[in-house]
């Protein structure tokens, strides 16, 4: 029997199929060893290549996913939620991963890049330097930091609109642009005045600090269409919807990403959603229902309200 195996291996090597054979055997071992795969969140957490990971997971024989906050952020962006779109681009810019959007998903960032280079032409954007060590040349680095600043300002504006429409979120303190003295380059918080590290905000009108300029509005309209119409992104996000959720009970184990709101004594804390209080399992289930409605609801108002909670 040993000679038979030796001849088989020799033949595989002789006909140049050794590498393919090793890969096939490795995949077989993996398949027999791992019966079912649990992905406990944040496939899209700042690192490179999430689109490649998603392609691999979609080809996997048995998998479930517990959504992380970064996954839900991308799902919201794919559904056209502007706050999520701006946040996704900002994070990609900050960590030098804009190629995920441009090359991985074919989303056109040229309008944003052109706007950023023109608007912040002479601005070094020191406060918007990239995290990590992206493989960029000097020109790419310069463009990325300017895009990072441009989309950050846009994010502040679009998120403020969401906060104003939803006082129940109690996030008014996150709206800070109206606290800035743009002439002095200072901001007043809780009665104290602080100097800003960055004082160049050419797209902010002190009288209407949260209003998008015409160029910013045009950019967001284009990006919204690009995210909603990207076939590959939609395919990946629907896979997350079909195979995932905010939690899963499997073999007596509770799987979830992130945290559950608790009181100081360790008991479950209630959170109000549209005037109703939810906690623990009920909170997770109602939030998950809004994520799904954000994709599948036919009523535009219901869809918009659901996307706000993403």
Regions found by a protein language model. Give the residues of each.
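Short secondary-structure boundary/capping segments
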Residues: 4, 53-57, 78-91, 261-279
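Short, small-residue-biased leader/transition segments that mark boundaries at the very start
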Residues: 4-5, 69, 310
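A catalytic-pocket lid/entrance helix-loop region that shapes and gates access to the active site
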Residues: 74, 81-104
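Extended, H/D-rich, highly charged conserved domains that either
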Residues: 162-207, 211-220, 224-308
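Active-site environment of divalent metal-dependent phosphoester hydrolases
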Residues: 45-47, 70-75
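Low-complexity, highly charged intrinsically disordered N-terminal segments
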Residues: 1-32
């Amino acid at each position: 029997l040993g000679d038979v195996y030796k001849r088989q291996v020799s033949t595989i090597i002789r006909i140049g199929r050794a590498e393919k054979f090793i890969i096939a055997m490795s995949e077989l071992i993996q398949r027999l060893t791992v019966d079912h795969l649990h992905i406990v969140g944040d496939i899209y957490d700042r690192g490179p290549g999430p689109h490649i990971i998603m392609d691999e997971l979609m080809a996997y024989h048995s998998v479930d996913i517990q959504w992380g906050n970064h996954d839900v952020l991308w799902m919201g962006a794919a559904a056209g939620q502007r706050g999520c779109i701006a946040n996704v681009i900002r994070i990609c810019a900050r960590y030098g991963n804009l190629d995920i959007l441009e090359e991985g998903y074919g989303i056109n960032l040229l309008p944003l890049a052109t706007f950023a280079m023109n608007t912040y032409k002479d601005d070094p954007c020191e406060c918007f330097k990239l995290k990590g060590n992206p493989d960029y040349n000097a020109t790419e680095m310069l463009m990325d930091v300017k895009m990072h600043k441009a989309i950050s300002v846009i994010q502040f504006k679009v998120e403020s609109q969401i906060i104003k429409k939803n006082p129940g979120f109690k996030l008014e303190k996150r709206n800070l642009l109206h606290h800035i003295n743009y002439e002095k380059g200072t901001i007043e918080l809780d009665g104290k005045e602080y100097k800003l590290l960055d004082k160049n905000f050419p797209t902010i009108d002190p009288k209407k600090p949260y209003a998008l300029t015409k160029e910013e509005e045009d950019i967001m309209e284009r990006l919204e269409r690009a995210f909603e119409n990207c076939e590959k992104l939609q395919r990946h996000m629907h896979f997350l919807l079909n195979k995932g959720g905010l939690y899963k009970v499997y073999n007596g184990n509770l799987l979830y990403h992130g945290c559950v709101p608790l009181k100081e004594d360790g008991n479950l804390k209630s959170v109000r959603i549209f005037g109703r209080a939810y906690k623990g399992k009920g909170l997770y289930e109602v939030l998950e229902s809004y994520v799904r409605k954000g994709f599948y609801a036919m009523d535009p108002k219901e869809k918009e309200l659901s996307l706000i909670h993403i």
